[in-house]
Amino acid sequence: MNWQQAVETTVTGMGYELVECERSARGLLCVYIDRVPGSVYLTGPGEFVLVEDCELVTRQLRYLFEVENVDYSRLEVSSPGLDRPLRKVGDFLRFLGSDVDVTLKAPFQGRKNYRGLLRQAGDTPEQGFELVFQDGKEDKVLGFALDEVREARLVPVVDFKGRMRQTADAPQGAAQETGGHEE
């Protein structure tokens, strides 16, 4: 078993999804993990990867690498981020209804890059997927199969409104955190 298979077996055995695994020329191993929807984790509930999840996986992988004699200088375990890559059929199915950036291998109507809403083309994943995107003022649909895709990523959605609302809802005399000083 090579080191990538060992990493995948370990990560999935712990209940996480292995999103990506890369090795740089200088011995850096980067492992990107995600939580599986509907699973229960020792580190607590939620759909997003926590620092504690990364710590658990890091600890387990260090033991594995010692036993398997894997040569590396540094190990980084991280979440895939807000712009998570979509690689497998399961990734596309999981994020149906999400905004996605898709780069095609070959241009279609003079373009390779598309951004739009991800849908399933038919009743089964084998029938491919669709991207509903705006071209000018009208919606258009791009149908594609996974083997036509060079890269696909979620469009990052950052919402700061929740934090602002909490600050605005604070009682008038309550101290807010401003570098350890009260205002």
Swiss-Prot record:
Pfam families in the record: DUF150_C, RimP_N
One GO term of the biological process aspect: ribosomal small subunit assembly
InterPro entries: Ribosome_maturation_RimP (IPR003728), RimP_C (IPR028998), RimP_C_sf (IPR036847), RimP_N (IPR028989), RimP_N_sf (IPR035956)
Record's GO cellular component terms: cytosol
Localization annotation: Cytoplasm
Domain of life: Bacteria
Keyword terms, alphabetized: Cytoplasm, Ribosome biogenesis
Family per record: Belongs to the RimP family.
Annotated function: Required for maturation of 30S ribosomal subunits.
Protein name as annotated: Ribosome maturation factor RimP
Protein's organism: Leptothrix cholodnii (strain ATCC 51168 / LMG 8142 / SP-6)
Gene assigned in the entry: rimP
